[in-house]
Regions:
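Short acidic-hydrophobic catalytic motif
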Residues: 84-88
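ABC transporter nucleotide-binding domains
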Residues: 1-54, 59-73, 79
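Generic structural signal for secondary-structure transition and capping sites
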Residues: 9, 19, 50, 95, ...
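Acidic, glycine-centered active-site loop in nucleotide-sugar glycosyltransferases
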Residues: 90-92
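Histidine- and/or cysteine-centered catalytic micro-motif in compact active-site loops
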Residues: 57-59, 83, 100-102
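ABC-family P-loop ATPase nucleotide-binding domain
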Residues: 173-193
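Short, charged/small-residue-rich alpha-helical element at the C-terminal edge
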Residues: 94-173
Length: 193
């Protein structure tokens, strides 16, 4: 099977514990169990100081494994850098909020502290989940104040864009590729040691 072929190729690549590992679509053909095992192997390699170059269309796997990315489409560099910084740069100022009981956000919306509050579908025993949008860089504390005045806050986290969402936005031209400065002479070589 393709998964077994992939395993043999990966084992042959990693048996000598290389300092630099290049993996092209390593999750292709793997079931979830073998995909999880490969994640563990990659984590061990990283812990031992290996540099791993990963080429993949599996954006959730890339998000799980990589700390730094280069997003390339048709041979053109669209975006590169630390994944956490990239997600922060393209955030939508949205928050996922869970409460013990329903919350009325209408006063906060009317006051301009919140743009929208969408109640997400839920099962009977689950907390109430909302997707909250706030204006630009405004303070998210207003969300917490609104909730705590009416209910118990179960969870609160910022919803950052998924890497697959960013890829689609860039590939469709909704975002402009990052500008790459011309390298000076000192930057034109790559040192491998």
């Amino acid at each position: 099977s393709k998964g077994n072929q992939q395993k043999v190729q990966i084992i042959a690549t990693l048996v000598h514990e290389p300092d630099l590992v290049m993996l092209d679509e390593p999750f292709s053909g793997f079931d979830p169990i073998n995909g999880a095992l490969l994640n563990q192997v990659i984590e061990r390699l990283k812990e031992h100081g290996a540099t791993i170059v990963l080429s993949s269309h599996n954006m959730p796997a890339v998000e799980e494994i990589c700390s730094s990315i280069a997003l390339i489409n048709h041979g053109r560099l669209l975006l590169s850098g630390p994944l956490r910084e990239i997600k922060q740069r393209f955030r939508h100022h949205q928050y996922e909020v869970q409460t013990a009981s329903p919350v009325d956000f209408s006063a906060a919306i009317a006051g301009g502290a919140i743009i929208s509050a969408e109640l997400m579908p839920r099962n009977n025993r689950e907390p109430y989940s909302y997707l909250i949008q706030i204006p630009g860089e405004s303070n998210s504390n207003r969300i917490v104040e609104t909730v705590c005045g009416q209910s118990t806050l179960v969870s609160f986290k910022e919803k950052l864009p998924a890497l697959s969402e960013l890829f689609i936005r860039f590939a469709n031209g909704e975002e402009q590729p990052m500008s790459i400065p011309e390298p000076d002479e000192a930057e034109t070589f790559i040192k491998l040691n």
